A protein has these predicted regions:
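Extracytoplasmic/periplasmic substrate-binding proteins
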Residues: 219-222, 269-270, 276
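Aromatic-lined carbohydrate-binding surfaces of glycoside hydrolases
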Residues: 1-231, 248-257, 284-308
Length: 315
């Protein structure tokens, strides 16, 4: 349970005005709901207000999720003769060639489209840690997925091994499902692919996915090493074919107990994105006050490609 405001140190809880009956700090949906459904409905109402405010200010907004990540209760839906999922070390991986997996994926997308009909982008993220322990050869015993693998594995020349190629084909199938579903719904939302920037995550698959996916799908990728390293050089090559967004980190989530001076990182990474002819940069963060200098630097160079202030001048 969250800490009660009355227990905040040094009587700082006195500055918070809480709704009647609430003991913790948070939005009304979190602290006044009496059921899970009420909580979800209030959260969605709040996000509809956020979307409305964004559009009033000329800001476009994306919503999405990690594809192929579903609640464990759903795996009981498996039926005889259908290879719905493969077992991993600590989770189960849905098979995108299974009709059950496809319908669950469509339902998640439809929930966003129905709840936020004016959403600008649907952002699909390759799962950060989904494939540990999957037996690729066992997975390829499913004939529909095996056919997809044989047809598309050669696209992923940069992948390190058969397991990485497996993930590439798996991601490709999910992105194809998403793209076709958005078209079938007549949605105006554009599709974005995103993922983590580690060497065994999205970067090694991006060129293969670029070869296979329609060019109106936007590619994005978190910068590697919790943002301490710049975006890969090959994004410049992909940017010749489609819109590409780099994703610098205003702060890393492994050190949120202190300030993280990243002014020079933001300066260099945003300037590099301009040199690579990337279509955009998106910054991620957890806190709002602590990374303010990093954010100001990010915004300065993102809004003016000609900016060239030194780090000393920025501070």
């Amino acid at each position: 349970l969250p800490m009660a405001v009355k227990d905040f140190a040094f009587d700082t809880g006195k500055i918070f005005q809480l709704p009647v009956g609430a003991e913790a700090f948070g939005n009304n949906g979190s602290i006044t709901s009496h059921s899970s459904r009420e909580h979800y409905e209030k959260a969605q109402s709040l996000m509809r207000d956020v979307l409305k405010m964004a559009h009033e200010r000329g800001i476009r907004m994306a919503m999405g999720f990690e594809f192929g990540v579903i609640p464990p209760e759903y795996f009981s839906l498996n039926v005889a003769g259908d290879c719905f999922y493969w077992a991993g070390e600590s989770n189960m991986i849905p098979n995108p060639k299974s009709q059950i997996a496809a319908e669950i994926h469509y339902a998640a997308i439809d929930d966003i489209l129905n709840t936020y009909p004016d959403i600008d982008y649907i952002w699909m993220w390759l799962n950060e840690h989904s494939f540990m322990g999957v037996d690729v050869q066992k997975a390829l015993k499913d004939k529909p997925f095996a056919r997809a693998y044989q047809e598309n594995q050669a696209l992923f020349k940069e992948a390190a091994d058969s397991s990485a190629r497996f993930v590439g084909v798996w991601a490709l199938e999910y992105m194809k499902l998403t793209y076709k579903h958005l078209k079938s719904k007549g949605s105006r939302a554009k599709l974005i692919l995103g993922g983590w920037g580690g060497g065994h995550q999205l970067p090694s698959l991006l060129k293969g996915l670029d070869r296979a996916l329609p060019q109106d799908i936007i590619f994005s990728c978190l910068n590697p090493d919790l943002g301490k390293s710049p975006q890969p050089d090959f994004l410049e090559e992909i940017a010749r074919n489609r819109s590409v967004w780099a994703v610098p980190w205003l702060e890393g989530d492994h050190q949120l107990w202190h300030f993280q001076p990243r002014v020079n990182m933001m300066r260099e990474q945003v300037k590099l994105a301009a040199e690579q002819n990337l279509d955009g940069v998106i910054a991620i963060h957890w806190r709002t006050e602590e990374p303010r200098f990093n954010f100001r630097t990010f915004a300065r160079f993102a809004s003016d490609k000609g900016a060239d202030e030194s780090v000393d001048q920025l501070y």
